[in-house]
Amino acid sequence: MSQEEAESSIIYEEPIDIPLEDDDDEDELEEENSVPLSSQADQENAENESDDSVDNVVGSETPRSVTGLSVDPRDVADEEDEDEEGEDEDEDEDDNDVDNEDENDNDNANENENELGSSRDKRAPPAVQTSKRYKKYPKLDPAKAPPGKKVPLHLLEKRRLGRIKAAEEFAKTLKKIGIEKVETTTLPATGLFQPLMLINQKNYSSDYLKKDDQIFALRDRKFLRNNNTSQISSTNTPDVIDLKSLPHSEASAAPLNDEIDLNDPTATIVIHPGSNSIKIGFPKDDHPVVVPNCVAVPKKWLDLENSEHVENVCLQREQSEEFNNIKSEMEKNFRERMRYYKRKVPGNAHEQVVSFNENSKPEIISEKNDPSPIEWIFDDSKLYYGSDALRCVDEKFVIRKPFRGGSFNVKSPYYKSLAELISDVTKLLEHALNSETLNVKPTKFNQYKVVLVIPDIFKKSHVETFIRVLLTELQFQAVAIIQESLATCYGAGISTSTCVVNIGAAETRIACVDEGTVLEHSAITLDYGGDDITRLFALFLLQSDFPLQDWKIDSKHGWLLAERLKKNFTTFQDADVAVQLYNFMNRSPNQPTEKYEFKLFDEVMLAPLALFFPQIFKLIRTSSHKNSSLEFQLPESRDLFTNELNDWNSLSQFESKEGNLYCDLNDDLKILNRILDAHNIIDQLQDKPENYGNTLKENFAPLEKAIVQSIANASITADVTRMNSFYSNILIVGGSSKIPALDFILTDRINIWRPSLLSSASFPQFYKKLTKEIKDLEGHYVNAPDKTEDENKQILQAQIKEKIVEELEEQHQNIEHQNGNEHIFPVSIIPPPRDMNPALIIWKGASVLAQIKLVEELFITNSDWDVHGSRILQYKCIFTY
């Protein structure tokens, strides 16, 4: 590079002050400057006629680029410099060439001005001024710019303006097509489906969110499928290990790399925790392993000095007046039912039972003649779990139950801390998995996944704690959760809209399932179940002079006897209710086996009939256990931003707790107003759940009324046309539902207590028509100018009430004109599938989920839990968490 070229490069690095408003003149100047370069090239090429490549470039017109801009004169200068270097010209000749170019520029500029017409004459003065500027400052002339240097600023500015114009044209094209970006939308959300997200204008032409790898759940699933690296290693490059050098131990028998095959049902364990027992097993097993929900702890390990509930007390035959009144009402209902079905009731049946039981004496059975003796456990040196805990004597052990109603038993008085409860949960699960049937050692837990069944109205804090225990403490590969009612439909093979009634040991849960979703506002949890029936049945037996008068119902052997009697004798079959002779064997620790004979009459039906009179259960409970320490350590879940309770808030649960049931209203107008106001109550529950009802209040609503409440709210909040399907598909499951003829009496009770308005087959059409007319009134109402806002609202409400009364009278007239029972929704109770225990249907449904491909998207791995925490449940749940 010459010295002059170096100096010119220094000038181009400095900022240049060039006016940008004369773009047209500058374009013209570029064309003019290109002409002398071409003429100079003609002169040089005349001397070298053998160079054909240069001849092709020579012309009277400057070639154009793709963008329509003139070819940069510096490119032509580059070619000239190369030719000059090839001829080995010295620096003096280069200086002469530059001077010749200046002369040619002036000559060619004058020639071009003469050839152009009058239209170009108008633009001549600016061009002349520009050429004069280049003469005054020759180093600013683009034609003299050295090769490979910066582009002039006026060209950069022109390109920028071109890009702005292109963006405007692109925006016009998007608007014409209809895919432009809209910041706000005024269209309200309608229907059951959420509106689609607006297109991302930035990435609309790319593959953004169009591949499975760009979706979190699918990307994580693919990673787990193809995971050939150790999860412990944090690097992407696996370590090179010599397999021959590894020790042949049990721990190394597992695959070196923790591969997770999410679609392998043999590597999945299904767990359904219940109040009475835990159902656990592999998905392909015919039946799960049923482990009693019991942990026997030696009394010497516990501080029970200040506990008044330790000693077992006998049931008192004498009860309160309120108890006797409810019992009299139940007996009256029983006699009316027997009379309706033409069953004869002996007048002196109760006297016959009492006289026989008073004179009944026990028969001693020797140990060798006992068909099923019990080997009681007296060794209090360790803990016992499951069925072994049931054989521990009460004098040396305390029975703790870590689960209640599908969640942690925070009401148990025997737990001092949450750590004790979690310890019992982990040890009980390890005991169940280590049984002979499953034979899964704790060291192999990391090779299995878990499908966990949770209640319909679940507590988020309990679910999250349970998942954390399974992933971090027991170290399973992954965990997926499913609600009980949905699992019930899977297990029973029902795909239509269904009302599921699950009668458990401690709780009874009701929920409606529609299109694979548990409807939130239909879920109800009743705080009574099979254990309450057992206790009440034992009390009725004692009031009939049961031979075993010192019966300690709270002792372990006393409770086992009561459970056995309830299972064998309670029934709803009218034909089986008579004065009959029965017998049983009493097995107690340190006592010989005794055989008793006794008689029963209506006690076999009165005890389960309390499902429809549940207030009597509240009167026979010894005390409402409450462990404030555990409730403080495991509080209810709250929103991180608003600090409001964020558990599921069911409208049916709230109304049944407060006693606001449709079946208790005799006026159809009140029922209709309550139904129309349901959406407002739902909004209030979601905004301020603490202000509406006590969450700790127990729910003792009658079973048949709760079912009607659940179906009505499910139909109103989701689709009112589903009401007929819900009444036609009522599925009863649970261990305490195995009472003969329960479906028969439940159908009668629903037909008796269901309001006439809600039982009409024309109610869905009536409700849809009424709501449409109310919306029309609200939309077309014109406020009076001389009235205040409150007065206008009162006028509108008066018109709405008038319309409701008018439509209701028309509905009553239509019902009266119909004949027979064709206008009434039929009630149908679906029996469990043949040869299937109703207590195991929920577990079976969860095992079905574990074998379908959908479960791959629901599994939560340990890495997911570490990174996202409980937020991962919002993305990997089959329901709205």
Curated annotation (Swiss-Prot):
Family as reported in the entry's similarity comment: Belongs to the actin family.
Other remarks in the entry: Present with 1010 molecules/cell in log phase SD medium.
Protein's GO biological process: chromatin remodeling; DNA damage response; DNA repair; double-strand break repair; mitotic recombination; regulation of DNA-templated transcription
An annotated GO cellular component: nucleus
Composition-biased stretches (Acidic residues): 14-33, 44-54, 77-114
This protein's encoding gene: ARP8
Protein name per the record: Actin-like protein ARP8
Described function: Probably involved in transcription regulation via its interaction with the INO80 complex, a chromatin remodeling complex. Exhibits low basal ATPase activity, and unable to polymerize. Strongly prefer nucleosomes and H3-H4 tetramers over H2A-H2B dimers, suggesting it may act as a nucleosome recognition module within the complex.
Plastid as UniProt keyword: no
Assigned keywords, A-Z: ATP-binding, Cytoplasm, Cytoskeleton, Nucleotide-binding, Nucleus, Phosphoprotein, Transcription, Transcription regulation
Pfam families xref list: Actin
Residues noted as binding ATP in the record, renumbered to the chain: N502, I503, G504, A505
Localisation: Nucleus; Cytoplasm, Cytoskeleton
